[in-house]
Curated annotation (Swiss-Prot):
GO terms for biological process: DNA recombination; positive regulation of metabolic process; regulation of DNA-templated transcription; regulation of translation. SUPFAM superfamilies: IHF-like DNA-binding proteins. Signal peptide: none annotated. This protein is one of the two subunits of integration host factor, a specific DNA-binding protein that functions in genetic recombination as well as in transcriptional and translational control. Keywords: DNA recombination, DNA-binding, Transcription, Transcription regulation, Translation regulation. Residues 49-71 are annotated as: Disordered. This is Integration host factor subunit alpha. One of its GO terms (cellular component) is cytosol. Heterodimer of an alpha and a beta chain. InterPro entries: Hist_DNA-bd, Histone-like_DNA-bd_CS, IHF-like_DNA-bd_dom_sf, IHF_alpha. One of its GO terms (molecular function) is DNA binding. Belongs to the bacterial histone-like protein family.
Length: 98
């Protein structure tokens, strides 16, 4: 099971008493701000949660798994996430739900 933006909105609606529309807009604005920061090359630091960083990957040789043909994998920029210590310890100490 995955946590969705709709579930986040519903949680804000229930816990904070926001209207469903405002809760949905708040979630959308949060993710849009994270996207905007990353598009502008900025690091996103969420205290107690973790950091989103950008990393440039160089071009490298690759291979088509079907044909075995050598193909170059182009240079690109990727988003990485590094969990913070608080998040790591909470996840490590959580009991798995089935």
């Amino acid at each position: 099971m995955a946590l969705t933006k709709a579930e986040m909105s519903e949680y804000l609606f229930e816990k904070l008493g926001l209207s469903k529309r405002d809760a949905k807009e708040l979630v959308e604005l949060f993710f849009e701000e994270v996207r905007r920061a990353l598009e502008n090359g900025e690091q996103v630091k969420l205290s107690g949660f973790g950091n989103f960083d950008l990393r440039d990957k160089n071009q490298r040789p690759g291979r088509n798994p079907k044909t075995g043909e050598d193909i170059p994998i182009t240079a690109r920029r990727v988003v990485t996430f590094r969990p913070g210590q608080k998040l790591k310890s909470r996840v490590e100490n959580a009991s798995p739900k089935e």
